[in-house]
Amino acid sequence: MKITLIQPSVGKINNKPYIKSWTMEPLALSTLAGLTPDDIEIEFIDERIDELPESYETDLVGITVETYTAKRAYNIANKIRNQGVPVVMGGIHANLVPDEVSKHCDAMLVGGAEGGIWNKILDDFRNHSLSKKYDSNAYFNPILEHVNPRRDLYRNKGYLPLGLVESGRGCPFTCEFCAITSAHKAKYRAKQIDKIVEDIGNIPQKMLYFADDNFVSKFSRTQELCDAIAPLKKKWFSHGTINMANDRKLLKKLQKSGCSNLLIGFESLNEHTLKKMGKSWAIVKRGYSESLKILRDHGIAVYGTFVFGYDEDSVDDIKKSLDFAINEKMCLAAFNHLVPYPGTALYSRFLKEGRLIDKEWWLKDGYNFGDVSFSPKNFTPEELSKSCYDARMQFYSFSNIIKRTEFMANCKDPFLNPFQTFAFMSANIISQKGIKQRQSWPIGNIIDNYGKILE
């Protein structure tokens, strides 16, 4: 028996290379491959890098689906099914809009593939009794089963030089706009620490990315994990929260374990907007500056993210956030417009208020990366998109990269630790290039250099 696993692209421009910053290792599919019995042959195709075949010589195809890849995934699946090959779909988009996903596949997995459900799907397929829907969320287990990913599938693909690892999944917070909250029902599941250490031991890269939704969901458990991975002498980064700065013991352990950078979602500098988002827990009474200094003092650089489009947001708020990120010497930053992901509380609110430009914006012909899919209060959709793009470009201008050079966290000592300085400069240059490439990148289609849809 042979299975083909496909990672769809967001979309492509014919004869143009795919965006480098979007080519991390696809951990979900290598994990799925790790769950697959040894007697099944696995073919792995990453459309971001590989060309899709015209015909599929395989027994079963598995496709992972995110909101931004959904349209492309459906096009691929429809072509494969027309050849008589059955398709199984899963991924976060299947959690958010299962009824939509189920229209484009023979079987759909809602929730994670661990816990025996993937083997159940394979057994049912072999016995010609495949069900339309499988739901692992019905059997919630706070312990997330560890699987050794098939990292051999990454060979010769040219991914970013980062080793991806997962220590937990989900997030306990309930932010209005967050698809993770909706997909995992604000629940967090952690893997066993000894299994994580074992997995890291199999990763050749010196820099790791913990692809957790929130690496510090439970401070006590994070400290235990840091103690366990410190002897491995790896550098790593992940997602955190600003309230980490309240726990000096945690920060020391993060630093000792090799943490060099954390992505922190500030989202807004306006307390009222944070409350509207459901992020009142992120309000820091002493101010962000002191907390950021504490993080820098522990050698932790910050990748700050901000989101705009709430009703009190204005051009001035974007400017204040940009100045704040530059003055605080953030290693990296993102200035994004609000995205009403399906299945989220934000999507439901905008739908009720009649503010969605298109109810299924992710499937709309002509939708491009950077397009705003709702009607903001203080901007036109085009103004909001351009304001966010301009802020990104200003943050990553050469003069502002130099301004953000900082030797406690971003670069350390450039003579004693040239790797950190090189990493800082490289990440900023790649980000600058990626911003230009991403803006107006086609979502869901392959287009030619003149914008004509090829497929």
Where would I find each of the regions flagged by the language model?
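Acidic, low-complexity intrinsically disordered segments
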Residues: M1-P204
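Radical SAM enzyme core and accessory elements
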Residues: K2-L5, E41-F44, H104, D124, ...
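Flexible glycine/acidic-rich beta-alpha junction loops that bind and position SAM and/or redox cofactors
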Residues: P8-N14, E100, S220, H272-G278, ...
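Aromatic/hydrophobic pocket-lining residues that form the small-molecule binding cavity
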Residues: L29, A73, W118, I193-I196, ...
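A structural motif corresponding to the C-terminal end of an alpha-helix
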Residues: L35-E43, S291-V302, E328, Q394
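A structural preference for short, hydrophobic beta-strand core positions in alpha/beta folds
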Residues: F44-D46, M89, S238, G304, ...
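Catalytic cores of alpha/beta
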Residues: P98-K103, L250, E312-N327
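Radical SAM [4Fe-4S] cluster-binding motif and immediate context
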Residues: V147-Y303, Y310, D323
